[in-house]
Every structure is written in C-alpha cells, then in structure tokens.
Amino acid sequence: MNIEQFQSMLEEKGIPLSSRQLEQFEIYFETLVEWNEKMNLTAITEKEEVYLKHFFDSITAAFYYDFSKPFSICDVGAGAGFPSIPLKICFPHLKVTIVDSLQKRINFLNHLAQKLELSDVAFCHDRAETFGKKEGVREAYDIVMARAVARLSVLSELCLPLVKVGGTFIAMKGAAANEEIENGKYALEVLGGDLKEMSTFQLPFEESERNILLIEKKRKTPKKYPRKPGTPNKLPIEK
C-alpha cells in the first residue's frame, strides 16, 4: 500500500487526511524503522507493508466505530503504538493512554509523541493486570482497545476492568475470531461485557481476514478481576 492508496482508501471511508497528518505518518514510519534497529518493535519494516499492516490496519477500527467525539481511550499492550497512535493522528481530539509492560517500548512512545507533537497522550509502564486495579483508571475509559495481544478469554480480563459502564471494548482480531468468541463468551459474561457487533472484512491487497469486535460494558467488573500478573494467561476464564 503506497501513500496515495493509503490516503485515498481512508478518504473513501470518510477519513480525509491533511498534509500535516500525512507528514505525521511519514515521521512515524521513519522513527519506527530507526528505533527498530536498536530494539525489537516490529518484524514489518518495509514502507508499503508498514502503511498497510500497521497504519491502515489500526485505523480500520474507525470504519466500524465513530471516533468523532473526544473519547478517552486506553490501548492495552500497544507495543509500537498500534492501534491507538494511528487513530490519534486521524482523530487528534482523542485522549489516549497506552499501557505496556516494557519500559523500552514506553521510551520509544514518549520519543514518538514528541516527534509527532501529540497532546493528550499518556504512556504507562505497567502490566495490564496491575493497572486495571488502580483507582482513577479502573472503569474510567470510554473505550479500551487491543490489537493482537491475546485470545479473547484472556484479553477480556485485561481490558474490561478498565472500561467504564456504558463504554466499549474494541478487540481487533484475525481469522480465528469465531473460535475465540466461542471460548471467550463466559469471560465476557463474568467481567460485565456483552458482544454487540462483529465486523468481518479483508485487509486490502493481501486479502487476509480481519474481525473487529465491539463489546459493550453492561455491568461493573467484579473486584477480584483482573487477577495477578500472569494468571489470566495461565488460567483463562473459560468453562
């Protein structure tokens, strides 16, 4: 996906980009590749691939959810900033918090935010299991997002405790989404979530399947969740 295709495909979806926003994506790409030489941020470094599989793929969430309001968003395990930083570039009014367990990635994100001149962004070095217990952030976000972090039964325990009641958990998934939903239904129920919508589409050019799950937070998450670091992965909430 070259820059012209990136721009025109987003415009078709009602997301026009200014020259400044296109410049921000260019700076993002250059910074990602530069830092990737000294630390492992991504296996994808070829320009057209980064624009398709990182930038465009992240923004697809906005094809199925309206980001036009100044929502507070928490991105769990964003790594090099996906999906929330591409969304923040497209929708500058969003208030973004990223939680990541690796300090090196947080250092990269702080540097990136300066280079991109982003405001209303916060980067927290923490495990999602610990972060989700903290006063002030627990059940505080309009939207919590994650892209390819863990299977749904595990991911729900990391994300739903952070979503305010009435808010939305957006899980960005690949081709195994149906199976993950089947295995993750019980976790959603326990944690106060309800799957409202699943949208399936093909990522352009490479035609790989993507699924975007919109999960509404209906009830407060029981206090015992999330459990201590590592437990959700070892012992997922499954029947």
From Swiss-Prot:
Superkingdom as given in the UniProt entry: Bacteria
Residues that, per the record, bind S-adenosyl-L-methionine: G77, F82, A128, E129, R147
InterPro entries noted in UniProt: rRNA_ssu_MeTfrase_G, SAM-dependent_MTases_sf
Key words of the record: Cytoplasm, Methyltransferase, rRNA processing, S-adenosyl-L-methionine, Transferase
Major enzyme class: transferase
An example Gene Ontology CC term for this record: cytosol
Keyword Nucleotide-binding recorded: no
Pfam families linked to this entry: GidB (PF02527)
EC number: 2.1.1.-
Localisation: Cytoplasm
GO MF term set: rRNA (guanine-N7-)-methyltransferase activity
Family affiliation: Belongs to the methyltransferase superfamily. RNA methyltransferase RsmG family.
HAMAP family: 16SrRNA_methyltr_G
Function recorded in the entry: Specifically methylates the N7 position of guanine in position 535 of 16S rRNA.
Protein known as: Ribosomal RNA small subunit methyltransferase G
Organism this protein belongs to: Bacillus cereus (strain AH187)
Designated gene of the protein: rsmG
